[in-house]
């Protein structure tokens, strides 16, 4: 995971993995739902690295947009980039990109290409609650500090 101060992101993470057999469908390339799982894995890693893992269980998805741009194949190395773009009082918005690199069976291969990008919005719903609530102050401070943005007074 890497924080990116000065890039406009409040906080960010970059995760690398491979397309596994379970990620593919009958057409021989990744199943669309795999993109969502890779994004959520990167989100969990970002919060774990910031010491905020408990947050993940209280942040249901309220909006998800995915643009599928290119297929990814079994064994292919991929990189997921996640950026926290907006931290609201009760929700937060992420942008993401999933990049595919060189397929193992293609020697000399092509340069990485974007396979998917999109937007993910989560809301703060504490355990036992049924409606959104404000994010805890310690979470806001930690996220803002990760991106080099000072907390609002």
For every predicted segment, state its role.
Residues 2-15, 68-77, 85-153:
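HotDog/MaoC-like acyl-thioester-processing domains
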Residues 50-59:
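Short, basic/aromatic beta-hairpin or loop at an interaction surface
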């Amino acid at each position: 995971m890497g924080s990116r101060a000065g890039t406009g992101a409040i906080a960010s993470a970059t995760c690398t993995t491979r397309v596994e057999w379970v990620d593919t469908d009958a057409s021989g390339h990744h199943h669309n739902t795999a993109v969502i799982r890779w994004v959520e894995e990167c989100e969990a890693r970002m919060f774990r690295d910031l010491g905020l893992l408990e947050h993940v269980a209280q942040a249901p998805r309220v909006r998800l947009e995915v643009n599928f741009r290119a297929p990814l194949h079994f064994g292919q190395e991929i990189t997921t980039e996640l950026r926290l773009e907006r931290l609201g009082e009760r929700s937060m918005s992420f942008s993401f990109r999933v990049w595919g690199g060189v397929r193992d069976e293609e020697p000399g291969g092509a340069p990485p290409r974007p396979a998917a990008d999109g937007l993910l919005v989560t809301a703060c719903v504490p355990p036992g609650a049924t409606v959104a609530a404000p994010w805890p102050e310690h979470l806001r401070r930690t996220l803002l500090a990760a991106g080099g943005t000072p907390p609002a007074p």
